[in-house]
Amino acid sequence: MFNKKIMLIFNILIGLITIYVIICLVIFLSQRKLLYHPNENNYLDENKLTHKIEKVFVKSDNKLIGWYHFKDRKYKTLLFFHGNAGNLQNRIYKLNEIAELELNYLIIAYRGFSGNEGKPTEEGLYNDSCLLYTSPSPRDRSL
């Protein structure tokens, strides 16, 4: 009787541990899909840019597409990676608000988003941000 209870508890623990390991494995194997969502064109047509931008192309391992808004040289430039879902057009409402500040901005889409080549990776994001951070502004040289 005592051995049956111990075996039952042991079997339940083994089952719970197995389920936990399977869940962890599934999450680990699908982490890229969980972090980087596909493009969706769910932006509203009434979202129009209220300011001028320049379309820029950044050469890293892949060619990246971005938008640059230049207001004045005396202002700092905000480097903005728009996020892990959607595309540049999905961020127009944010860009209109940023344009009202005393800032220039450069918004870049992740690899694999907004027509960019490649696949998004953590290492690629670090490399792209370091390249853009250490580069002169698009006004100073062609990216």
Q: Could you describe each region identified by the protein language model?
A:
Residues 133-140:
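Conserved small/polar residues in nucleotide/adenosyl-binding loops
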Residues 2-18:
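N-terminal Sec-pathway targeting helices
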Residues 65-132:
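Membrane-embedded segments
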Residues 59-63:
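Glycine-centered tight beta-turn/hairpin loop motif at sheet-sheet or coil-to-beta transitions
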Residues 17-57:
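An N-terminal hydrophobic leader/cap segment in hydrolases
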